[in-house]
């Protein structure tokens, strides 16, 4: 996509309003949550904030010094946002105390906590969530995935029984009858480079929950491979097949099957030939890739070649919703991820 110039240069030139994200906006507006944006050093934050506040998608906290806010918010109306200066916040000591409490076994002192919070605003954002002053956080427009996730793992932790965080994209493919009328969850596309059978099974369960939460339909999870039902022999195939067994044992209420090639997972005619007795093949709507490489490449292929909407990466498995952005994101991508984070916060509060 080519950016248009001037004030709207952080939005896509041709923005197709898709039904999925409209439903997410509506859900977010119905029960507004407070989301922290720690990247006041990026103008896209303020372009997104203007739209979020104008449309009532979420309450916003923006972390930044007066200089950062003044420089990067020029031309944007962020009336209604709460601005928190990390160097002069009356609640700062509360967050320092919480940081030390959570990381005392790692030797974190109050001085170390203060320095880290002032140097990396994502730590500040996570502490605001931990202390109940915010419901979620979104970062990553100008920080790496690692820099976004690390504070969340250290301070917020994973949900009980969850061993690791994974990331999914909600894909909306135009003019497509596959999946749930063109809606899919793709995972893991963003986080975990060291997947094994146990972790893949966990990704399958988390992704099924995410699909049901965001799409409102029953998930059908395909564990993808270059083999269908043993058509090829390789340790990578065995890893996926073992993940299917683990998932079916641990999560019997979820429809999970594999290993399946992509065409067998999606196309009924191919499924009839390659996996005729499968409960998922030919109708999968949740795709679990066998590696981070495959997932990351796969979502980008569909996004670029099929002109699909790619909403995410949305993190799953954390105790509170914290989400990452692509450093190449547009402001409207930030708006979408904030809305999805708000919906996750609604679910977490139930």
List the predicted regions and their residue ranges.
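Anion-binding alpha/beta catalytic cores of soluble intermediary-metabolism enzymes, centered on
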Residues: 17-281, 286-350
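Short, Lys/Arg-enriched N-terminal segments with co-localized hydrophobic residues
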Residues: 1-17
